[in-house]
UniProtKB/Swiss-Prot annotation:
GTP binds at R256, V257, H258, S259, S260, Q277, E299, G300, R301, T321, T356, K361. The record marks H130, E168 as: Essential for DHBP synthase activity. Residues 1-205 are annotated as: DHBP synthase. This is Riboflavin biosynthesis protein RibBA. Its EC number is 4.1.99.12, 3.5.4.25. It catalyses: D-ribulose 5-phosphate = (2S)-2-hydroxy-3-oxobutyl phosphate + formate + H(+); GTP + 4 H2O = 2,5-diamino-6-hydroxy-4-(5-phosphoribosylamino)-pyrimidine + formate + 2 phosphate + 3 H(+). Catalyzes the conversion of D-ribulose 5-phosphate to formate and 3,4-dihydroxy-2-butanone 4-phosphate. Catalyzes the conversion of GTP to 2,5-diamino-6-ribosylamino-4(3H)-pyrimidinone 5'-phosphate (DARP), formate and pyrophosphate. D-ribulose 5-phosphate binds at R30, E31, D35, R144, V145, G146, H147, T148, E168. One of its GO terms (biological process) is riboflavin biosynthetic process. Residues 206-405 are annotated as: GTP cyclohydrolase II. It comes from Cytophaga hutchinsonii (strain ATCC 33406 / DSM 1761 / CIP 103989 / NBRC 15051 / NCIMB 9469 / D465).
Length: 405
């Protein structure tokens, strides 16, 4: 099958800057769909009409987390159980200003423009309405690989406020339009066609989420390593890279992405398998002679130490690790891997022999443009205190552990 040629990100940014609509496609392993996207500041009734007629999906308005706070736009639901956790807020209409039904192309374009107008106040927006704001992650596609973040990133890169307009593109029969048809649509209307994957690559090349702060020698009882501290620019959080040896640019490197676990890594808690996994990974890399352990500041799968202890208390009352997270208002796994991906790129790693039993981790890192050449299993014996925890990771989170007979 002939490879479909996509446009460059630079050309797409220029099109957005000119107020044009473009098509953005995501990964075939995610939704494998395309969206019409433009900058919110450039939306017109004509663009809304075009999107509605040719896209046939749901018109949404991705905006920044800060803007959601300013306009007091709460999330539509407290616990998001959608497949890809699309961050819908309450829907809105602009009140007054010539708006009537809220659904006309004119009314919807006015509502979207109001979302980015600094003079708009929360009371200027009626709830519910006909425009669906989406709350984009602050670091865009480097935090979440979705059209929501792509729209905001493209608007920002084009010099506009971080807000966009998007709609899913459907075929005439109501099914989702896939890449070959999206290419035809792009050609028909002379639109730029890009992928989120290429946008991630562009941002990773032109921007930095992390700063290398300091490196030191780190002799351990499992071997001699180098330790480098990276500061996450947006949050100030510090992440560590424990490094053994050197490698060529395109060489597959053994890597473990390990989330910090005070209870397991430091106190030797038997409630999880984190400490043994960390030490086993160090042994594997020491034996390999080269490799990296990323020690990410993401305690409790990203919910923080205090909330992890609250989750432990719920587990003592009969919940499993997933149920406890959900009851506390978190996802089963709150982590993102964009920061870790950029640290690996800083370390000149693009191909990984990833030490993991977690399929989500493999897919997430691959989504940031890293090539996983091999998933290297890490076998840790269970104990009476963590057996149910490990079973939950296997049965509810898909980890390849405790294989059933």
């Amino acid at each position: 099958m002939e490879q479909i040629k996509l446009d460059s990100i630079a050309d797409a940014i220029e099109a957005i800057r000119k107020g044009e609509v473009i098509i953005v496609v995501d990964d075939e392993d995610r939704e494998n769909e395309g969206d019409f996207i433009c900058a919110a500041e450039c939306v017109t009734p004509e663009i809304i009409n075009f999107m509605s007629k040719e896209g046939r999906g749901l018109i949404c308005a991705p905006i920044s987390e800060a803007r959601c706070t300013e306009l007091k736009l709460d999330l539509m639901v407290g616990s998001n159980t959608a497949t890809h956790e699309t961050p819908f807020t309450v829907s809105v209409d602009l009140l007054g200003n010539g708006c009537t039904t809220g659904i006309s192309a004119s009314d919807r374009s006015k509502t979207i423009r109001a979302l980015v107008d600094p003079d708009t106040k929360p009371e200027d927006l009626g709830r519910p309405g006909h425009i669906f704001p989406l709350k984009a992650k602050d670091e865009g596609v480097l935090r979440r690989v979705g059209h929501t973040e792509a729209a905001v990133d493209l608007a920002r890169l084009a010099g506009f406020k971080p807000a966009g307009v998007l709609i899913e593109i459907m075929s005439e029969d109501g099914s989702m339009a896939r890449l070959p048809e999206l290419k035809q649509i792009a050609t028909k209307f002379n639109l730029k066609l890009i992928s989120i994957k290429d946008l991630i690559e562009y941002r990773l090349t032109h921007e930095s989420l992390v700063k290398r702060e300091i490196g030191v020698d780190m002799p351990t009882n499992l071997g001699d390593f180098d330790l480098i501290a990276f500061r996450q620019i947006s949050t100030g959080e510090v992440h560590l890279a424990l490094i053994k040896g050197t490698w060529e640019k395109d060489e597959p490197v053994m890597v473990r992405v390990h989330s910090s676990c005070v209870t397991g890594d430091i106190f030797g808690s038997c409630r999880c398998d984190c400490g043994p996994q960390l030490h086993k990974a160090m042994e594997m890399i020491q034996q390999e002679g080269k490799g990296v352990i990323l020690y990410m500041n993401q305690e409790g799968r990203g919910i923080g130490l205090l909330n992890k202890l609250k989750a432990y208390k719920l587990q003592e009352q009969g919940r499993d690790t997933v149920e406890a997270n959900l009851e506390l208002g978190f996802k089963m796994d709150q982590r993102d891997y964009g920061t870790g991906a950029q640290i690996l790129r800083d370390l000149n790693i693009s191909k990984l022999r990833l030490i993991t039993n977690n399929p989500v981790k493999r897919a997430a890192l691959a989504g940031y443009g890293l090539e996983i050449t091999e998933a290297v299993p890490i076998e840790i014996p269970s104990n009476p205190h963590n057996l149910e925890y490990l079973k939950t990771k296997r049965d509810k989170m898909g980890h390849t552990i405790l294989k059933k007979d």
